[in-house]
Amino acid sequence: MELKVLNISLNSLNTVEVDDTIFARDFNQALVHQVTTAYMSGSRQGSKAQKNRSAVSGGGKRPWAQKGTGRARAGTTRGPIWRSGGVTFATQPRSYAQKVNKKMYKGAISIIFSELVRSERLKVVKEFDIKEVKTKNMIALLKVLNVKDALLMTDELDENLYLSSRNLYHVGVCDTQSIDPVSLIGYDNVVVTELALKKIEVML
């Protein structure tokens, strides 16, 4: 398969040959969903904690005698039915991580890229020419590329590109080492440099 390589003026410079087994795979919704869900689950902090009856301070002594008072027996004032008592099924810190094989993860990334190519939402450019850190330069670049909501991908993190775009909520910047399924499906368009595309092909 061949993809057009554009310059910043959207003129086609040349084409780049890409592997069909990576950029022309059939869509597998179940795999993409599983990998995306696993990635999001792994991002959860999982530090929520509540106190059960044994973790609440106090309540060591019986509030009244077992027999003779006429009241219902009670062994502690920290049971779940008491005011200031513990939580019945208290949540504890836990990991929400799900295991995903490398082959499955790479397969899902490849399928997402294939779908981007099919829907013409993947643009390949020679390079991003951002000489200085200015948001207006980034807005001008997006206007030329005819995209509003986009993930810009480079082979190595471009500091000028990142700093120029960080004030735009609908624009993301990453390098090939930081690719994740949530970012790829979270933007309307993905704009990738030619060098980054070749790196991705080697990685997948």
Swiss-Prot record:
Sorted alphabetically, the Gene Ontology BP terms of this entry are: translation
Q: Where is the composition biased (Polar residues)?
A: 42-55
CC annotations in GO: ribonucleoprotein complex; ribosome
Record's SUPFAM superfamilies? Ribosomal protein L4
* Known partners and oligomeric status: Part of the 50S ribosomal subunit.
- State the function annotated in the UniProt record: One of the primary rRNA binding proteins, this protein initially binds near the 5'-end of the 23S rRNA. It is important during the early stages of 50S assembly. It makes multiple contacts with different domains of the 23S rRNA in the assembled 50S subunit and ribosome. Forms part of the polypeptide exit tunnel.
Q: What is this protein called?
A: Large ribosomal subunit protein uL4
